[in-house]
Amino acid sequence: MTFNNKTIDELHDLLVKKEISAVELTKATLEDIKSREGAVDAFLTITEDAALAQAAALDEKGIDADNVMAGIPLAVKDNISTKGILTTAASKMLYNYEPIFDATSVAQAYAKDMIIVGKTNMDEFAMGGSNENSAFKPTKNAWDQTKVPGGSSGGSAAAVASGQVRLSLGSDTGGSIRQPAAFNGIVGMKPTYGTVSRFGLIAFGSSLDQIGPFSQTVKENAQLLNVISGHDVKDATSTINEIADFTSKIGQDIKGMKIALPKEYMGEGIDPQVKETILKAAKHLESLGAIIEEVSLPHSKYGVAVYYIIASSEASSNLQRFDGIRYGFRAEDATNLDEIYVKTRSQGFGEEVKRRIMLGTFSLSSGYYDAYFKKAGQVRTLIIQDFEKVFADYDLILGPTAPTVAFGLDTLNHDPVAMYLADLLTIPVNLAGLPGLSIPAGFVEGLPVGLQLIGPKYSEETIYQVAAAFEATTDYHKQQPVIFGGAN
């Protein structure tokens, strides 16, 4: 028996009516995970015993009819801390690390009686766009197992797209939720910076990182964001997002809404078929009453360069804590303190992580700080100002989530610059701290294309409103890969 084709609302109705139990739903989910895992390799840890025990306790307590998330299984990216459950960030450096606390987002999920069924694969320390930088294994795309699932939250995206779970958590530093969502044909939201607490998220770029939800549908995405959002005193960058219910505008029409289409998002480097798909999506939104107009974000072309200086510099600082002394991997052949540091970090970090640490350390070093890190911060301000100018006249921005559909395994992982450029459409959103959502908008040669909707800070309600209107009048979200039982 499987329930992976039912929405959260439908599952909740079954649970409340006691037509299924939380244990039955959890067992069915675990079976879905096991039956598909060999094909997609989405999980690093499956928490079968703990999940079943949690579900049994919930059945004994009873399902609260007002708590739509009670008993719903959830997969969690492996850089989000889970008490007593391996949290490796897909790195040899943390191969045996079990946190003694839960991330705030995980604690919030537990508080709503969600059932955590496992930890998902990712690029090591969230550095990568293909999931091939995992120290343990590459995850495969749900639609075509010869393609990448995107990164860094590729495991979380593939788990939802393949029908292993309905919902998962990821993190997004430069596109790591939206790009995998696009590549796998599902919904992925990077909320406004500060909307979801970063407490318990293993830090990569502290001014950029944000936890967010993956789902099959727009409403389910908003429902999960309701769970994990909220101000947290444990996170100094946590903000108060006044939106009480992210689902509140879903179902409202979008007539008269002004949506901008930046010419830079449809120019050089964008696959012509992806561009055609997005223009078709824009026409569809026009047919629903939205007003689509071309605008310019002139400094977005510098986004990738700015991002890789700022993110790598922050990573260089954040990853200093992994030294072989306190926890995690320690080199066995070290004979003194200096060797412990050098050999542990040389052996424990993967090539991409070491590349970014070196890049960041260089950017912060004496004599180069002004030329690189300071200048990157100044251009970041210009990128923010570009967005502010557009949002003075428009409700949202739309464009492709990624310049191409999912590419083949072992094609870009030896070309770091090409891999970095794959994030050129998502990175500016992180630099500006804005919310961005990717939704399925079509297919190119059998692979999903993602439509990205970007709004001003704290506009998640409006983004979900437009996304839901698009979803309700198209069937892209209903199409499923073969592994999920679909015909594609």
From Swiss-Prot:
InterPro entries attached to this UniProt entry: Amidase (IPR000120), Amidase_CS (IPR020556), Amidase_dom (IPR023631), AS_sf (IPR036928), GatA (IPR004412)
Domain of life of the native organism: Bacteria
GO molecular function per UniProt: ATP binding; glutaminyl-tRNA synthase (glutamine-hydrolyzing) activity
Reaction(s) the record says it catalyses: L-glutamyl-tRNA(Gln) + L-glutamine + ATP + H2O = L-glutaminyl-tRNA(Gln) + L-glutamate + ADP + phosphate + H(+)
SUPFAM superfamilies: Amidase signature (AS) enzymes (SSF75304)
Residues the record marks as active site: K77 (charge relay system), S152 (charge relay system), S176 (acyl-ester intermediate)
GO BP: translation
GO cellular component, one term: glutamyl-tRNA(Gln) amidotransferase complex
Pfam families linked to this entry: Amidase
Record's keyword terms, sorted: ATP-binding, Ligase, Nucleotide-binding, Protein biosynthesis
Enzyme Commission code: 6.3.5.7
EC category: ligase
Subunit (UniProt): Heterotrimer of A, B and C subunits.
Described function: Allows the formation of correctly charged Gln-tRNA(Gln) through the transamidation of misacylated Glu-tRNA(Gln) in organisms which lack glutaminyl-tRNA synthetase. The reaction takes place in the presence of glutamine and ATP through an activated gamma-phospho-Glu-tRNA(Gln).
Family: Belongs to the amidase family. GatA subfamily.
Protein name as annotated: Glutamyl-tRNA(Gln) amidotransferase subunit A
Organism: Streptococcus suis (strain 05ZYH33)
Gene: gatA
